[in-house]
């Protein structure tokens, strides 16, 4: 008893560590098989107890392994890796993309620019969580050689169509009607079915909605002096940007810096779409392929008209040659078909009526009415025959076709657009001839044994025959008589065969009578038609030419902005300086936009209109928005505005610009009304009285204090110059720091007098022709390795009238000081103003920096006197 209790206690207290590295529950089972062959050994109580413990530990090894698998806590790293690998395997390559490996100096923006796309699109294609990329990373980028198919998703981007999931593909397979329906699933098959793997699509609905928030348009940027380049216009709710194509010849010649521009949307004052460009300077730089129709298209148009007339001539000639055989055969075949009931004919009647209405729209009134009368009467005759022959069983059993097929075959001549093999017509005709006993009457009919559809010539010939029939009314009367006979045949079914025979003879005799007349008239009709078509082709050619000129492939978008657009391929400082240089110019930018994208632009600007948000409050929102300008709001006082309004298709303006135009329009209308009523306003009185006072005040305010009297400038010339000086010079006295009368003619002396000076300087030159001109420098003159200065620099001349030429923004060539020369402006190897080391010889030429003409009378001049003034 004690031994048994002891063994039970040992069994209860003993445990096995299943997590131990040396534990193997199957090891005992594996060793148990070879031990069974050994002879049994004498058992002691201790050995028996150990064997019982081993047997208990081996009873449920599978259960313990399952518990270990489901309840063991691990780190989860392997599971996470497997899940990531599965997701990576299920991510499909988007259509229209290629793999690109990120290089050391690449960024997401540079990659997007390299493949003509946007960074947002790359983020969407590759499912990126940030814009950071690392070297060696593989990205999917748009394939430039990919052509999107019709089945691709209609998104703005030609790439990244939606890829269907595998479950959707399975659903499409099961719902396809052509596939045999599978058997009903059994309960066991429901558990054995493999669960479909979820495939990550290339885009989602949210991302598609995001891509619709901007427009990406391939267009051309038209400049006044730098030509026309092709590129991409990107319009977003915040910015408008144009990126030129690197492959454009002008871009390769001048660089991207000249054509890449960007502007915030809040700076846009108006956006208008024009049919043509009104600015003469812009219009001169417009390429020929955009401005007018090329001569190659006109020659192609002539070839098309000639080919059309030749084709028409051949068709009519072939129809005239075959008129004798085609007309009887077609009419015979149309009546030698199996008969059918009126209920089966009703859908064919409806189809015939609709086709006759369509033909009535295409052809003239008289000819279409005759064709319609003949075809409808023919249908009535067929209906009578079918009703008369519907009772006998041997007639019903003689048909080898369905009702729809027979209806299509019998209406071949009336519809003029269906194709019918002659073999089927022969079978139907033979069946009807066997039934009615009319074989001997049809021996003279010629029929072919080959299967061929009705060609275009025969269809055209049949249509000409029907239009040229002079006895349509007689045919209608004869067919009415046949209709009356058919009504009597309803009561007497045995007379149906006789009526079929009479109707066959009627059509055959009529067609034979018409053959001679048609042969004679076909030649006249063909000649008249050829002459008419040639004249029509010439008229259509000229009309098409005018129509193509009026509706060109391109229309012109004009953007007017408050400040000049910033260059995107230059540094921030250079872009700011260029904006400052163009501050006094008219800020208009022209783009040649494809005609099909004009509506997209209009809809985009209308989408950001503030009207929907301002209706309830009655106040205009501060958010940037646009308002459509109506033509009745435009001023029509002068001819220029009328021409502009006629050429403009639509225009949207900002809220501020809209109110400014309304105020200006109201003010102008009020002034016009006052002039018409001869009413003097207070503004007119004040303007008349204060004109001399204001002139005196302006002259006093702009007249500076000079340290020394000037020998080169007159007082009025000083005032004119002062108005164009930068604001930082206003209020400072003019100090003479160098003059040839005081310091001599030496460039080195000039540099020495400028030492330690930190103000702008004004150089005035008088040449041997007594002409005064000069330059304003933003910094004192000095010896430099390259050009220096900023956009405040300009050149001027009083020869013959006062003109100022400020920085154009084309380049940064302002001032260049050498030991033997001093130059202003540059570009193309020419300087706006150049002086030698002795300050005796000089040269002036037009340059790109200032856009000036020659400042002196002659390009080469001799210096008579020089004055340099500083502002301190």
UniProtKB/Swiss-Prot annotation:
The modification Phosphoserine is found at residues 90, 201-202, 204, 294, 334, 336, 346, 496. Residues 150-168 have a biased composition (Low complexity). InterPro entries: LysM_dom, LysM_dom_sf, TLDc_dom. Its main location: mitochondrion. Residues 1-86, 150-187, 314-338 are annotated as: Disordered. Residues 212-268 form the GRAM domain. The keyword Transcription does not apply. It is found in: Mitochondrion. Residues 98-141 form the LysM domain. Residues 711-872 form the TLDc domain. Belongs to the OXR1 family. May be involved in protection from oxidative damage. This is Oxidation resistance protein 1. It comes from Bos taurus.
């Amino acid at each position: 008893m004690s031994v048994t209790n002891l063994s039970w206690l040992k069994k209860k207290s003993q445990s096995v560590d299943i997590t131990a590295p040396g534990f193997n529950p199957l090891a005992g089972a594996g060793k148990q098989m070879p031990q069974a062959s050994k002879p049994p050994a004498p058992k002691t109580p201790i050995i028996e107890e150990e064997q019982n413990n081993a047997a208990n530990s081996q009873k449920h090894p599978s259960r313990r392994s399952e518990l270990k698998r489901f309840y063991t806590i691990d780190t989860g790293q392997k599971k996470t890796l497997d899940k990531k690998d599965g997701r990576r395997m299920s991510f499909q390559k988007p259509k229209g993309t290629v793999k690109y490996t990120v290089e050391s100096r690449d960024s997401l923006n540079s990659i997007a620019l390299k493949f003509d796309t946007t960074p947002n699109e790359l983020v969407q294609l590759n499912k990126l969580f940030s814009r950071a990329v690392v070297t060696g990373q593989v990205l999917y980028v748009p394939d430039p050689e990919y052509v999107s198919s019709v089945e691709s998703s209609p998104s703005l981007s030609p790439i990244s169509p939606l890829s269907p999931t595998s479950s959707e593909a399975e659903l499409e397979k099961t719902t396809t009607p052509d596939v045999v329906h599978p058997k009903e699933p059994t309960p066991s098959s429901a558990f054995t079915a493999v669960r479909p793997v979820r495939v990550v699509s290339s885009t989602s609905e949210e991302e598609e909605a995001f891509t619709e928030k901007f427009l990406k348009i391939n267009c051309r940027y038209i400049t006044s002096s730098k030509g026309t380049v092709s590129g991409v216009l990107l319009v977003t709710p915040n910015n408008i940007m144009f990126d030129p194509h690197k492959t454009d010849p002008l871009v390769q010649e001048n660089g991207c810096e000249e054509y890449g521009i960007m502007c915030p949307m809040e700076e846009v004052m108006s956006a208008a779409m024009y049919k043509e460009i009104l600015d003469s300077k812009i219009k001169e730089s417009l390429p020929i392929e955009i401005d007018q129709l090329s001569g190659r298209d006109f020659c192609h148009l002539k070839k098309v008209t000639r080919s059309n007339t030749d084709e028409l001539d051949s068709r009519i000639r072939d129809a005239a040659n075959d008129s004798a055989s085609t007309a009887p055969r077609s009419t015979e075949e149309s009546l030698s078909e199996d008969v059918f009931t009126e209920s089966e004919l009703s859908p064919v009647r409806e189809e015939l009526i609709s086709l006759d209405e369509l033909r009535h729209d295409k052809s003239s009134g008289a000819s279409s009415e005759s064709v319609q009368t003949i075809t409808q009467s023919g249908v009535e005759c067929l209906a009578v025959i079918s009703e008369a022959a519907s009772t006998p069983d041997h007639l019903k059993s003689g048909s080898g076709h369905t009702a729809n097929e027979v209806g299509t075959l019998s209406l071949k001549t009336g519809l003029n657009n269906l194709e019918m093999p002659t073999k089927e017509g022969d079978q139907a005709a033979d069946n009807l001839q066997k039934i009615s006993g009319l074989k001997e009457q049809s021996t003279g009919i010629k029929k072919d044994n080959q299967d061929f559809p009705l060609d275009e010539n025969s269809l055209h010939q049949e249509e000409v025959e029907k239009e040229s029939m002079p006895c349509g009314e007689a045919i209608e009367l004869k067919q009415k008589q046949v209709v009356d006979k058919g009504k009597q045949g309803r009561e007497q079914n045995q007379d149906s065969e006789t009526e079929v025979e009479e109707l066959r003879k009627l059509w055959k005799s009529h067609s034979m009578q018409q053959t001679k007349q048609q042969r004679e008239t076909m030649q006249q009709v063909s000649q008249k038609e050829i002459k008419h078509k040639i004249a029509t082709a010439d008229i259509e050619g000229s009309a098409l030419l005018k129509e193509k000129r009026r509706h060109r492939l391109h229309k012109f978008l004009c953007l007017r902005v408050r400040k000049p657009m910033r260059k995107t391929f230059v540094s921030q400082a250079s872009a700011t300086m260029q904006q400052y240089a163009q501050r006094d110019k008219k800020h208009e930018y022209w783009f040649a936009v494809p005609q099909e994208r004009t509506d997209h632009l209009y809809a985009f600007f209308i989408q950001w209109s503030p009207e929907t948000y301002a209706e309830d409050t009655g106040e205009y929102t501060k958010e940037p928005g646009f308002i459509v300008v109506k033509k009745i709001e435009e001023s029509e006082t002068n001819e220029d505005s009328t021409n502009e309004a006629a050429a403009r298709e639509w225009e949207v303006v900002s809220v501020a610009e809209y109110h400014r135009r309304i105020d200006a329009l109201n003010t102008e209308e009020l002034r016009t009304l006052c002039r018409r009523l001869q009413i003097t306003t207070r503004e007119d009185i004040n303007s008349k009285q204060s004109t001399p006072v204001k002139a005196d005040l302006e002259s006093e305010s702009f007249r500076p204090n000079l340290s020394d009297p000037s020998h080169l400038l007159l007082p009025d010339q000083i005032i004119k110059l002062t108005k164009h000086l930068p604001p930082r010079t206003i209020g400072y006295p003019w100090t003479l720091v160098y003059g040839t009368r005081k310091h001599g003619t030496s460039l080195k002396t000039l540099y020495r007098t400028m030492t330690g000076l930190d103000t702008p300087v004004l150089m005035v030159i008088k040449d041997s022709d007594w002409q005064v001109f000069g330059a304003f420098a933003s910094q004192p003159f000095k010896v430099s390795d390259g050009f220096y200065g900023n956009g405040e620099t300009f050149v001027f001349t009083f020869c013959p009238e006062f003109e100022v030429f400020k920085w154009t923004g084309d380049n940064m060539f302002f001032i260049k000081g050498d030991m033997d020369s001093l130059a202003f402006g540059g570009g193309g190897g020419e300087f706006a103003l150049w002086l030698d080391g002795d300050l005796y010889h000089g040269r002036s030429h037009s340059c790109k920096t200032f856009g000036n003409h020659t400042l002196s009378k002659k390009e080469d001049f001799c210096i008579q006197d020089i004055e340099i003034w500083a502002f301190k």
